[in-house]
């Protein structure tokens, strides 16, 4: 190979030397109007002339010759389109049961009456007559939808009434409604957190929070699940010796009750660390609003922390209030900022008026019937007691959480294998004992680092016999499977 390259290189070098000698020779120089013109100027002039010639030429257009029918058919036969989406992996396939009635404490699944522990209906308000009547009245007055975003003729008086009702109930300055519960948190986080900001989040946050963190494009650091020592260590590292720390917006993002574990966040300790290291707190209360606290006002009431010490509170209204949509509450400044900067508020059609009416009726019911909270806590305690000795499984959730989370005592070492065992248990419980429960199946987009498990949603509408039935069924099936 080298024997072929060397002669070519030598010949090229010799040719370049001759060209250089020619243009530097006296014959290649001229005097025009007293100005000496070297050979390289002649070459540059020729290049300019060539460029102008090329620019002035008309573009070449190949002759238009249409394809024959045979050629068209051949091209169509050879074309292999890419699939619109990748094929579904076997582990991602879900054969979901079909509900044929409202998802109350008792429902119909695939034509069979079952006890329902798979739906979040904490206060047992699904099917409540007063809430249904308020929805009917709202539909008769406003119709079923607003047909526009809040800023474009989508605001109806019932929206403003609901926002005021929630703010007054929680003791905050103002609140703002969102059309869809899960979109609340992943619209609020990007509205306040931008590129260059720092977010410290619990590693166990659910997918909607994860999505908000990703959309914010902020620098996200995770601390160990519900571990305040881990949180304090990370806050110390982020602030110690950082000269620009005062110029960077910093947030702590946690859930009041974690959907992926049923654990309760220690808000008093989080607020102490927040004030020490000068962070802001975004608290997601979808599973604690209407549940925790003496009167159901959430995590702040549960710990006795002044609500104004929490910068931003969000919650979905589908778990305790038996409606849909979500809200964010806090100071007037926090709420007003979202009316122009939150994508889920600005670009979505507003919450249907009848759902806002249902939310207000549910809050009124909670205020007028505080005993519903006692019923809920009694059911949670009873279920914990009955499942304390379940074979092969253990309770990982807090005693006050309406999410009773069961995980394997001895994991297999593979999340896929663990999930298969849990799904077998859930399927057997449904088919053999007519008890509807669900395993925590996660998509490939969910980056939660916690173990999978079986999640039971306890309702104030469940009876003691319901609790005994699900406990006995789970014990029997778990003993045969695990």
Swiss-Prot record:
Gene3D superfamilies: Aspartate Aminotransferase, domain 1, Type I PLP-dependent aspartate aminotransferase-like (Major domain). It comes from the Eukaryota. InterPro entries: Aminotransferase_I/II_large, AON_synthase_class-II, PyrdxlP-dep_Trfase, PyrdxlP-dep_Trfase_major, PyrdxlP-dep_Trfase_small. The chain crosses the membrane at residues 33-53. Its cofactor is pyridoxal 5'-phosphate. Keywords: Acyltransferase, Endoplasmic reticulum, Lipid metabolism, Membrane, Pyridoxal phosphate, Sphingolipid metabolism, Transferase, Transmembrane, Transmembrane helix. Its EC number is 2.3.1.50. SUPFAM superfamilies: PLP-dependent transferases. It catalyses: L-serine + hexadecanoyl-CoA + H(+) = 3-oxosphinganine + CO2 + CoA. GO terms for cellular component: endoplasmic reticulum; endoplasmic reticulum membrane. GO terms for biological process: ceramide biosynthetic process; sphingosine biosynthetic process. Pathway: Lipid metabolism; sphingolipid metabolism. GO terms for molecular function: pyridoxal phosphate binding; serine C-palmitoyltransferase activity. It is found in: Endoplasmic reticulum membrane. It is an enzyme of class 2 (transferase). It is a single-pass membrane protein. The keyword Manganese does not apply. It holds the Pfam family Aminotran_1_2. PANTHER family: CLASS II AMINOTRANSFERASE/8-AMINO-7-OXONONANOATE SYNTHASE, SERINE PALMITOYLTRANSFERASE 1. Belongs to the class-II pyridoxal-phosphate-dependent aminotransferase family. Serine palmitoyltransferase (SPT). The heterodimer formed with LCB2 constitutes the catalytic core. Heterodimer with LCB2. Component of the serine palmitoyltransferase (SPT) complex, composed of LCB1 and LCB2. This is Long chain base biosynthesis protein 1c. It comes from Oryza sativa subsp. japonica.
């Amino acid at each position: 190979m080298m024997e072929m390259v060397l002669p070519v290189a030598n010949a090229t070098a010799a040719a370049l030397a001759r060209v250089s000698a020619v243009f530097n020779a006296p014959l290649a120089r001229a005097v025009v109007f007293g100005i000496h013109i070297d050979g390289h100027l002649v070459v540059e002039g020729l290049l300019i002339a060539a460029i102008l010639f090329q620019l002035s030429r008309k573009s070449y257009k190949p002759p238009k010759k249409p394809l024959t029918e045979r050629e068209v058919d051949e091209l169509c036969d050879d074309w292999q389109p890419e699939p619109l989406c990748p094929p579904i992996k076997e582990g991602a396939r879900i054969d979901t049961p079909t509900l044929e009635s409202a998802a109350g404490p008792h429902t119909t699944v695939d034509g069979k009456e079952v006890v329902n522990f798979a739906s979040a209906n904490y206060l047992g308000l699904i099917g409540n007559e007063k809430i249904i009547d308020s929805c009917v009245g709202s539909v008769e007055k406003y119709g079923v939808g607003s047909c526009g975003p809040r800023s474009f003729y989508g605001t109806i008086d019932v929206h403003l009434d609901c926002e005021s009702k929630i703010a007054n109930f929680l003791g905050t300055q103002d609140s703002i409604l969102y059309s869809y519960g899960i979109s609340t948190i992943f619209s609020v986080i990007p509205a306040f957190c931008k590129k260059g900001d720092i977010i410290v989040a619990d590693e166990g946050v659910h997918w909607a929070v994860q999505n908000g963190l990703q959309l914010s494009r902020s620098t996200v650091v995770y601390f160990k699940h519900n571990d305040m020592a881990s949180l304090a260590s990370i806050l110390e590292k982020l602030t110690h010796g950082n000269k620009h720390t005062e110029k960077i917006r910093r947030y702590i993002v946690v859930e009041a009750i974690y959907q992926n574990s049923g654990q309760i966040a220690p808000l008093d300790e989080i607020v102490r660390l927040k004030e020490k290291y000068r962070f802001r707190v975004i608290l997601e209360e979808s599973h604690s609003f209407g549940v925790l606290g003496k009167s159901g006002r959430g995590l702040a009431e549960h710990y006795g922390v002044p609500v104004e010490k929490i910068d931003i509170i969000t919650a979905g209204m589908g778990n305790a209030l038996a409606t849909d949509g979500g809200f964010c509450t806090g100071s007037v400044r926090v709420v007003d900022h979202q009316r122009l900067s939150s994508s889920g508020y600005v670009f979505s059609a507003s919450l249907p008026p009848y759902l806002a009416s249902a939310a207000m009726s549910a809050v009124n019911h909670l205020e007028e019937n505080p005993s519903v909270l006692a019923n809920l806590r009694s059911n949670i305690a009873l279920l914990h007691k009955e499942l304390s000795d379940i074979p092969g499984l253990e309770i990982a959730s807090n005693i006050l959480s309406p999410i009773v989370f069961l995980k394997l005592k001895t994991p297999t070492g593979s999340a896929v294998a663990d999930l298969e065992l849990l799904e077998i248990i859930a399927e057997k419980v449904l088919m053999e004992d007519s008890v509807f429960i669900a395993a925590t199946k996660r998509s490939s987009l969910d980056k939660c680092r916690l173990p999978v498990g079986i999640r039971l949603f306890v309702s104030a509408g469940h009876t003691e016999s319901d609790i005994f039935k699900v406990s006995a069924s789970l014990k029997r099936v778990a003993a045969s499977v695990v």
